[in-house]
Amino acid sequence: MEGDGGVQLTQSPDSLTEEDVCVIQDTWKPVYAERDNAGVAVLVRFFTNFPSAKQYFEHFRELQDPAEMQQNAQLKEHGQRVLNALNTLVENLRDADKLNTIFNQMGKSHALRHKVDPVYFKILAGVILEVLVEAFPQCFSPAEVQSSWSKLMGILYWQMNRVYAEVGWENSKK
């Protein structure tokens, strides 16, 4: 998987099957056990490959060297936040109301407070998938695992775009 990891905008929230949910939750356990390292790996890859994303992060906007990024306390903290948010999604895949609340809070925060362009959710989703496949090959090598995770990332991106549209993102970024 490279680039956007096959993440599609058209993934609707109900596109995960029960099998997808089980696959995602089972393969997530070893990742979350290594969340500190995984979160840093995701953000270092994200900012190295897409340096324009750093514009939204004043605490590590100037970092260029991946080794320096790995040691940055604020980057580590944000990596934990990303993985914790993903963990909350994974834990609640069968609770549509809870997921809707999570997506609304995350989307509104990033649209209104942080003013993050929603395209970065698609980019970050692809980076997450790439890092998971590379760092956890025993779990993420099978095509069906990658397909299930790609659906989840597509749902995340779809939902963020939905929330951004609801809050009038086009008007708020001008």
From Swiss-Prot:
UniProt source species: Danio rerio (Zebrafish)
Reaction(s) catalysed (UniProt annotation): Fe(II)-heme b-[protein] + nitric oxide + O2 = Fe(III)-heme b-[protein] + nitrate; Fe(III)-heme b-[protein] + nitric oxide + H2O = Fe(II)-heme b-[protein] + nitrite + 2 H(+); 2 superoxide + 2 H(+) = H2O2 + O2; H2O2 + AH2 = A + 2 H2O
EC number in record: 1.14.12.-, 1.7.-.-, 1.11.1.-, 1.15.1.1
Origin organism lineage: Eukaryota, Metazoa, Chordata, Craniata, Vertebrata
PROSITE patterns: GLOBIN (PS01033)
Annotated GO biological process: neural crest cell development; nitric oxide catabolic process; oxygen transport; regulation of neural crest cell differentiation; removal of superoxide radicals; response to cadmium ion
Disulfide bonds: none
Superkingdom of the organism of origin: Eukaryota
Gene from which this protein is expressed: cygb1
InterPro entries: Globin (IPR000971), Globin-like_sf (IPR009050), Globin/Proto (IPR012292), Globin_lamprey/hagfish (IPR013314)
Occurrences of domain Globin (ranges): 15-165
UniProt protein name: Cytoglobin-1
